[in-house]
Amino acid sequence: MSAQQPQHSKYGFSKTIDVPYEEAIEKARAALKEEGFGVLSEIDIKEKLKEKLGVDFRRYVILGACNPALAYETLQEEIDIGLLLPCNVIVYEQDGRTVVSAVDAAKMLSVVGNPKLESTASMVNEKLRRVIDSL
């Protein structure tokens, strides 16, 4: 099984892996749990697009992940931060492989403009990077 080195985009980091889609979702869930995140929501984009628009789309899921302690810390500092929570992790199929990506919390929280959130955002990113790296 070969895996690509993690990639970084403008707003997240990802890794393409040679693991079946369903297995990648389970591995991502397990890795998130290891880092103290719970999955609060799971949105099956393929299913929703078929249901709402009647269109076919690749298999694609959004996992809404939350680390309660870090979320609480952030909410204490910025009550409206809930608009940017939870941290999304996506899993989708591409060219016969599976891509797993996580949001860059530092970039996302930078829109708030509160320097007190920088250390928490860095901590979240470290955890999410470990999730992606472990796959």
Q: Residue spans of the language-model regions?
A:
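Terminal, regulation- and interaction-focused segments at domain boundaries
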Residues: 2-36
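Short Gly/charged-rich anion-binding patches and loops
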Residues: 26-27, 44, 77, 123, ...
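Short secondary-structure transition/capping segments
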Residues: 83-95, 132-135
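Solvent-exposed residues in well-ordered beta-strands and their adjoining turns
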Residues: 18-20, 66, 92, 103
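Well-ordered alpha/beta subsegment
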Residues: 111-135
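Beta-strand/loop substructures that line and gate deep hydrophobic ligand-binding cavities in soluble
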Residues: 88-114
